[in-house]
Amino acid sequence: MKDELFNAVRVTPSTKIRFKCTGCAECCRHVKESVPVNSLDVFYLTKYLRDTGLDICCTDEFLAQFATIALLDDCGYFVYFLKSVGEDDSCIFLNENRCSVQPAKPMACRLYPFMVDTNGSGGFRYLYSREREHHFCGPVVETRSWMKKYFQQEARAFMQADFADTVPIARLLRSIPEHGKNEALFHFHRLRYSEYNLDRPFLEQFLQNQKQLLIILGRMAEKTT
């Protein structure tokens, strides 16, 4: 999906395009370190796999088996991507040209061929990619309708909160000296990805964890001043 990002075109909610999923699974191949899984994705993927019989009980187990870590900024801020397998770097969940976690697939996959970013003022901006031209045929799709179907309220609230805290968290991480960085990143992972009860609603846990993370990092940063 890296190519999709570089070839993205800005669209408005009223923009209409032609799109049809052909079942070719090309969007699931050549995706090494290209399919991000945010806290929301990790929660629901773990829950889905657990509830469908996989011997997995927590998000840490999911991340160890199915995700790879990537540094986003030299302050230590990191993210996760789904692992890829095989010579063609297929998504680890691609099975016989079908997604094996379809009901819980990541936000990036649900929204394809569209992408969502925040606009800096509490709203969203939308993009789409024409990287795979053969997808852009068939019925007309309106951005607004697509987002209403695939970018629902919980995902919107999560993304707004997540993006709002990204810069403050990165700033705090940057202010913590090297001798405290490992502890800071431990809390970063624990509260953003690990400390979740799969049987409780996600969003309230995420918001509580983010608040706690900012408090902890703030206290650690204050010790250096």
Regions found by a protein language model. Give the residues of each.
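Short loop/turn segments that flank or connect secondary-structure elements
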Residues: 1-225
